[in-house]
Amino acid sequence: MPTGPELAKLIETLQFAKDQKTFHKLRFFRPYMKQQEFMNAGAHFRERLLIAANQVGKSYTGAAETAMHLTGEYPVDWIGRQWTRPIKAWAAGESGQVVRDVSQKLLCGEPGVDTMLGTGMIPKDAFVERPSLARGVTAAYDTVQVKHLAPDGRSVDGISVLRFKSYEQGRAKFQGETSTWRGATRSRRWMSTPKSSRVSRRPAAWCSPPSPR
């Protein structure tokens, strides 16, 4: 039988493992072959489109890659698109509610539950502060600030900014502001489009306009 100190150490270790799986999902992301092919293509193509059936991991894949770019945390064998500096990103969808229930949930955690912040693909300790709320949709986020790790993987070299947008806001909401990485969901597709794309009628997308690696 373990002694008191040994038992305490075991409990501490198990709690740490549980917290890692709960609040650091990105570190446990292991893509399937097709998901990996889609992400690898980012190293060579400005536009990417992923079409598949419902509930097979399209949005999950997009959220994982977006979290990598926001945080600077890439797998050691990563060969897709990569930024060595903080980025400005968009995550968009057909409506504010859809964006909240899909993109926001996968990236940040269950909407409307404070204790669930950090249970999405963005690690809990990567949030600079609690995200600001959007207008018109309960528990929907507008802007998220994320700590970006330097290439050494240890120090923070800046803050990435993620903004949630919806097509129902109109074209004007997508004009003027610059972004490094753009993503959107629509129907059963994921698609990446260049900076000048028309967003109001596009199918789903995670997009990376031209930018130095």
Question: What residues fall within each predicted segment?
Answer:
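Phosphate/NTP-binding elements of NTP-utilizing enzymes
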Residues: 1-213
